A protein has these predicted regions:
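Bacterial N-terminal signal peptides that target proteins for export
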Residues: 2-12
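C-terminal segment of classical bacterial N-terminal signal peptides
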Residues: 17-27
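Extracellular carbohydrate-recognition regions
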Residues: 31-78, 189-196
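Extracellular carbohydrate recognition and processing domains
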Residues: 50, 135-169, 175-184
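Hydrophobic residues on conserved beta-strands that form the core of alpha/beta folds
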Residues: 61, 105, 116, 151, ...
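Solvent-exposed strand-to-loop "edge" motifs in beta-rich extracellular domains
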Residues: 65-69, 108-114, 118-126, 177-179
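Short beta-strands within extracellular/lumenal beta-sheet-rich domains
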Residues: 87-116, 126
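Short, surface-exposed beta-strand/strand-loop-strand elements in extracellular ectodomains
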Residues: 128-135
Length: 196
């Protein structure tokens, strides 16, 4: 039987193992992953009020102001979102993810410089964060909802791995899955510099 607690333990262990494999590679292969950003989107310190000084960019369709994400299993766009106006105004929409529902972003370019995903979450239950690369769903983390709107913890995209496999850059999709309860998600961001 699936247990969110087991996933909370398994994901960091898998990430650490993959990082160890990558860092153990010969020095000659160290230049396989480009450290340049895939694009030149606007970066800002959206989470600085919560002691996160990293620069982030909005993921494609990450404000849920349009219907660019693919929704399945009862996922819906609903009125209201994070009240902190990190994008300049209060978010008018959010994503409702009842248990079993999923939402998948449009494709976006990542490389070793795009390691983290972060978003705002409210409601109850948990959200699974996956990265889809080359048709493979890669679990990246579990984000708990705690009632009112707050930033969720940082989850890892695995972009160094996908970028290394694909010659420097890769096209991925972000998939959010309702694992339990009825969480809501607002404003999905990618950190292109891993905390700096």
């Amino acid at each position: 039987m699936f247990s969110p607690r087991r996933l909370l333990v398994a994901v960091p262990c898998l990430t650490a193992a993959l990082a160890a494999v990558l860092t153990a590679a010969p020095a000659a292969s160290a230049d396989l992953v480009s450290l340049s950003a895939c694009n030149s989107n606007t970066l800002s310190r959206y989470f600085s009020p919560w002691a996160d000084p990293a620069y982030y960019e909005l993921a494609p369709g990450g404000s849920f102001s349009d219907s660019s994400w693919t929704l399945a299993g009862g996922a819906t766009l609903v009125s209201g979102g994070e009240p902190f106006a990190v994008l300049g105004s209060v978010s008018p929409n959010s994503l409702s993810l009842p248990s079993g529902a999923s939402a998948t972003s449009p494709s976006t370019c990542v490389d070793a410089a795009y390691p983290d995903i972060r978003f705002f979450v409210a409601g109850s239950g948990t959200v699974g964060v996956n990265v889809i690369y080359n048709g493979t769903v890669i679990p990246s983390g579990v984000v708990p909802a705690g009632g009112s709107w707050m930033p969720g913890p940082i989850t890892v995209t695995g972009s160094a791995i996908t970028g290394a496999e694909n010659g420097g850059t890769a096209q991925i999709q972000i998939q959010l899955v309702g694992l339990s309860g009825n969480p809501e998600v607002s404003d999905v961001f990618i950190d292109p510099f891993h905390g700096g």
